[in-house]
Amino acid sequence: MADWSLLPNDLLELIVGHLETSFEIVLFRSVCRSWRSVVPPLDHSRCLGIKTHDISFNAGFTFSDQPTDQPPFKSSVDCTLKNIPIYLVKFWTPYGDDYLIAEMREREGGEPKLLLSPLSSNRIIYGMGINKVLFNSLTSPIIPFGQYYEITYFKKQPIRYRYGLPYHLWNEVEWVETSERVEFLRLHSEDSRDFAVLFAGRMCNLVMYRSRNMSWTQVVEHPETYAYQDLVAFKGKFYALDSSGRGRVFVVELSLRVTEIPSVKGSQYCSKESLVQLGEELLLVQRFIPAGRRYDEYIYTWFKVFRLDEEGGKRKWVQVNYLNDRVIFLGARTKLCCSVHKLPGANENCIVFLASNDGSIFDNDSVLLFDLKTRRTNTAFNECKGYMGVFGANLKSLVSCGLVTIPNPTTRFLL
């Protein structure tokens, strides 16, 4: 095995020149002492930034399929593409090895990073009611685990009733900041800056942004106008899954050509579907609830998993009954899939998902687990404590090793 500490300084300085955020510098400095000597410590007041791109809106463009003469956006430059990183933090406690999976967000005024659960829609904040969550990158490995992209922009929205707002203003409009999940595809170019973005939101049409043209373009719709419930960038193309519940997936090429992958044979209607990427594989995951059952009756929930087969140049879905040592996490804004060897105490061949249809987490019973081998569904934390770190529910471990500090009740102000 190569000794990374022996790399020459000029090569290390070249690597540092390609780091895009200060958090990447923190990770670089955590490798070994010789690497830390190349880059001075960061000022603690400095924000650990995330990667962003400014995206312009072409004149008359809207995210609907109808052009308009009225500017639908506050400014032609008020759209920002953000890369949201997800990290796996490993640590050691008196109870054994443990981990935390966290999405990191900006906060204003140079405050510490905000740690969120990447899988919940109600934006569970790690450290809520707790003074600090401290990571020592020298003793707790911080490993890039995943990422997703979103665009943030201002749009017009009718003013809803507010306490104290005069009645005659209720029909007025206001500019509201909006964030939407998108898929990002980096393209090959000389300066490595060319990219494409695909966006669906809650619409029945797709729009694509090309950095080379600096404009958005409507993608031709397929004949049946279902909304799209999931998008993924895979092997230089976009894949869009509609909400028909029949496993209908469309391949969207950069030329705006759209082709449909033959639906899963004999597929029955499912309540929810997701596209999950694992390395060089693309998975279609279908969730079923028998007719007449409610979402909260999780014991009746079951899943099917299919792998995209591209052999012979023809795409088709092949059912998968075993995930080997892997586990799939289905969240509200992102999906993750990895080997359980990366997650201490986790069970393999499972799908971890959320009980509510909107991806909200209210308590530990909101997180469920489906075992592909036994075909049983149970609450995840009762079935396997190793999944608590995915949702920050392992507070006892976090406190025991000093990553989390609990407020001193004698010095805390009560409001």
From Swiss-Prot:
According to the entry, every stretch annotated as the F-box domain falls at 2-50
Check the record and name the Gene3D superfamilies matching this protein: 1.20.1280.50
Q: What is this protein called?
A: Putative F-box protein At2g16290
Q: Which organism is it from?
A: Arabidopsis thaliana (Mouse-ear cress)
Q: What is the lineage of its organism?
A: Eukaryota, Viridiplantae, Streptophyta, Embryophyta, Tracheophyta
